[in-house]
């Protein structure tokens, strides 16, 4: 049944726009150029407002997810990478449940990727319709059918651009993937802005700067009591403070430290005697994939809950899923969950709220650890990184594990890879929870994604440098 399903959608995949694989080896300088162009297009789309919207001043229902989903409210990048990640989540769950079986052949892999792209486009249309019909840009009846359709078309075209930009990098024209690049850019932009933002905010304590570092100098310059000013700069509420910034730097350091944890399996050439090497299995075997998929799951749950709350507020089942409240304290207006399932799956705002509602914290910890471990373990089966896939790759390279025959390699790799995937996912979830509880800027999930993505780019740079021989030859 599984292969039949992929065969059914094969004709639809054939008509989808596709980036062709490069016919020659792309030089590092060209990859940097294409990556920069991709990032430039994305940033431009983040600044172009949607034409036809009546209002976007209401409380932002997806404020908490925007940093992670690389989206920007009221612009062409309203949906961000959400459709791509959601389609990946759905396809992974279907493959993990054996509803869809992905074969080992390149044809099956290509068909699976095509199906993922098709679902991504369908989800883009679905999310665009939901955003418009729930009144995010104004009352649909007042805007009229023509304007509503125009907004949906704009969001669909922007979603298609994101899909193609991601595919451009994935096919080897650029560095890394579009999803990773957009997420890291958005998160780093948020951290820098909240540290150095010159925007002023009127609070009960008077006019203050949003940026934590600028606020420090402003408070020390304007307050007569310097000790109190220093305390306020470190611990002020509802705006970024220095403790948030220190927590962010601390989490960066911890994640980089954990990146070095790995097990090196000794391998040797089956053709040439005396040629030895190692195959590294990292603690973060699936990298940031678990946290991206977990974010997609929560993001879509938020969308459904918000949509139902708007239409059926007061319904018992809707309230069980999530109840929402608006706030504009210390920043832009935003909606946040105050009850129901969405509340318990959202991170506590600070360590103080953990002590106030420990049940919320415990449920959140269990959900984060469990979901990240689950997604990490199932991802290896559909991404070509399971023990069977690794053994096949080593065999193709005519390499075998020292002390093991070819037939026993899969069994030996199975001792390490599934464990590394599950435990690595567990650690990713744990680090994200720690960052949330410490109050790191950009959310624990965001910080974790930023660090792992930046580290991936560092590894790409080191790999390219080792192939060329020097940094000068690499860039010039």
UniProtKB/Swiss-Prot annotation:
UniProt membrane topology term:
Multi-pass membrane protein
What InterPro entries does the entry give? Answer: SecY/SEC61-alpha, SecY_CS, SecY_dom_sf, Translocon_Sec61/SecY_plug_dom
Main localization (coarse)? endoplasmic reticulum
Do you know which Gene3D superfamilies this protein is assigned to? SecY subunit domain
Which PROSITE patterns does the entry mention?
SECY_1, SECY_2
Write one Gene Ontology MF term.
Answer: ribosome binding
Q: Which UniProt keywords apply?
A: Endoplasmic reticulum, Membrane, Protein transport, Translocation, Transmembrane, Transmembrane helix, Transport
Compartment(s): Endoplasmic reticulum membrane
Taken from the record's topology, the Lumenal segments are 54-76, 139-144, 194-240, 310-354, 442-445
- Single Gene Ontology BP annotation: pronephros development
Q: Can you list the GO cellular component terms from the UniProt entry?
A: Sec61 translocon complex
Residues crossing the lipid bilayer are 34-53, 77-96, 118-138, 145-165, 173-193, 241-261, 289-309, 355-375, 421-441, 446-462
Q: Does the keyword Repeat apply?
A: no
**Which ranges does the record list as Cytoplasmic topological domains?**
2-33, 97-117, 166-172, 262-288, 376-420, 463-476
| Family that this chain belongs to | Belongs to the SecY/SEC61-alpha family.
This molecule's function is given as: Component of SEC61 channel-forming translocon complex that mediates transport of signal peptide-containing precursor polypeptides across the endoplasmic reticulum (ER). Forms a ribosome receptor and a gated pore in the ER membrane, both functions required for cotranslational translocation of nascent polypeptides.
Q: How does it assemble?
A: The SEC61 channel-forming translocon complex consists of channel-forming core components SEC61A1, SEC61B and SEC61G and different auxiliary components such as SEC62 and SEC63.
Q: Supply the name of the protein.
A: Protein transport protein Sec61 subunit alpha-like 2
Q: Which organism is it from?
A: Danio rerio (Zebrafish)
Q: What is the lineage of its organism?
A: Eukaryota, Metazoa, Chordata, Craniata, Vertebrata
Q: Gene name on record?
A: sec61al2
